Amino acid sequence: MHNITERDAQVGLSQAWHGLTDVVDEIDVKENVLTKWDVERKPLTYVDVDGNEQETGYGILVGTDDDQIIGKPMTPSYKAISNEKFLDLVSDAMSKLPKAKIESIGSVCNRGKVFVTVSLDGKSNYKVGDREFKDYLNFGNAHDQSSKLWINNTNTCTVCDNTFTYNLNDKSAMVGSAVHRGDIELKLADLSNVVDDFLGTQAEFRQKFNNLLKRKITDKKAQSLFTGFLMRNNPKEGLSTRCLNTVDSLNSLFKRGAGNRGENYADAFSAVTDYYTHNSTRGKGKNRLNQYVSSEFGLGRMNKQSFWTVVNNKDLAERTIERGTKLLSLVNQ
């Protein structure tokens, strides 16, 4: 369901699947469909037995343009985040990216949810070598209390309630979030810093990954690299059958994994990333929850980070290859 009601609108640079997009050539972060209205909190009151109006402490949001209700009653501790503050966060992120542009903006669910999708380089994805990386920075906020304010990085542009929910639930792509409680101004400032860190890290990743593409490595050395890496904590122990099977899996991904040709250190890193993202837990990742936890929070994540350090340090990579070569030579005796 798109859930674009009469009070909602979705503006974009191209027509979305629902056919309701107001297609434009450019979207200005300072003047757009979300600047035409905002939210205002009004107190919920009652009249006591003496005929006096009393406040309950609860409130309700209404649109500043039509005074119609948005969402449901709010507790005293709930802090609404206005469209103005939401767009300030988007604007701050875009100011760091000269090529960034808004691809989609709007609201759904009777203005209960608002969203902005920004392409970082003026397109939905970018390539480093033959590999394609996701390039949308999605911002979402709920006036109806159905979600926190969130930011993620995916290749899915938010154009409706379905894509809003999809991006909200893609935990592996989450950049940052803030709940509607406490010091909202401080949380938004912190979130802005988180986005800055993300953008800086992404730019650094592109440069380093491009360097890895230029560094060639043979199939044999890649096998030694994987072996030496897996045995980095126990170099004096012999290679187990499980370790050798893991090396075989990594070597296969090095040569035939998505985007890989078995030619360079980028292929080696992609092989390790693919393995620890999808296949590293018991049963080759068949238990998706266990695999996800390992990949994003546990041993899988640590191994991906450690291998990134190894391949970006030439001396460390050579030492790892030497260790792997020695261990493999003992197996082949």
Kindly give the residue locations of the regions a language model identified.
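Intrinsically disordered, low-complexity regions enriched in serine/threonine
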Residues: 1-44, 106, 121-333
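N-terminal low-complexity, intrinsically disordered segments
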Residues: 1-106
